[in-house]
């Protein structure tokens, strides 16, 4: 709830009105039949959550694409990345958004066949929280995913001696980054082999 503004006037003009609205909201959620963790029906609610995000992203137009990858695209990318594999050590998405690509890997391979879990990084706090909620709603145990809220290009959080066996991503296209404004970036082991940094107006090339 870190990015939830409980003092927003959209909830009501006074503190009492806002509290009444929040109580009503929580009671409404409490009364919903969301499925039981033990019988795995909670996964159906996760699918509904992704469907609603997809509808919202569609209505939001270009901005919606910042956090949501359509199911068809997620499935194609993940199948290409997992051809010939029945299990992998771990899956990574450096621009994970709401986590749709990570979850598609869980669905295609089976979550138990991703031995060390699911890893991702997302720069936007709200989208980062959406991703974590999405993981829980799809029955991914807390100790099987590691989502970080940082700028992947400037502050990668998932350095490891053992490389990721599968990397899937739909990075933000045509966004800006520091590029050669920060001369130390050329020493980054991810960029150094190229001998040049991606243009400041083409951060997507830095992801590649």
Task: For each feature predicted by the language model, list its residue ranges.
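Mobile active-site "lid"/loop adjacent to the S-adenosyl-L-methionine
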Residues: 174-206
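Generic detector of short, locally flexible boundary/turn motifs and exposed helical patches
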Residues: 13-15, 40-43, 55-57, 111-114, ...
């Amino acid at each position: 709830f870190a990015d939830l503004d409980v003092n927003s006037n959209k909830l009501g003009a006074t503190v009492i009105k806002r509290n009444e609205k929040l109580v009503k909201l929580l009671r409404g959620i409490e009364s919903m039949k969301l499925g039981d963790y033990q019988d795995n029906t909670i996964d159906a609610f996760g699918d509904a959550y992704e469907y609603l995000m997809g509808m919202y992203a569609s209505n939001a137009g270009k901005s919606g694409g910042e956090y949501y990858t359509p199911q068809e695209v997620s499935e194609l990318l993940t199948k290409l990345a997992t051809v010939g594999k029945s299990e992998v050590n771990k899956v990574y998405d450096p621009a994970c958004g709401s986590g749709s690509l990570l979850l598609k890997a869980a669905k295609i391979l089976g979550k138990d066949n991703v031995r060390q879990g699911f890893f991702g990084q997302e720069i936007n706090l709200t989208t980062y929280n959406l991703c974590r909620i999405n993981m829980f709603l799809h029955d991914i145990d807390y100790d099987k995913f590691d989502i970080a809220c940082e700028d992947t290009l400037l502050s990668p959080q998932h350095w490891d001696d053992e490389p990721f066996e599968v990397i899937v991503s739909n990075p933000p296209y045509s966004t800006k980054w520091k590029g050669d404004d920060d001369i130390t970036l050329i020493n980054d082991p991810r960029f150094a082999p190229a001998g040049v940094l991606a243009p400041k107006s083409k951060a997507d090339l830095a992801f590649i």
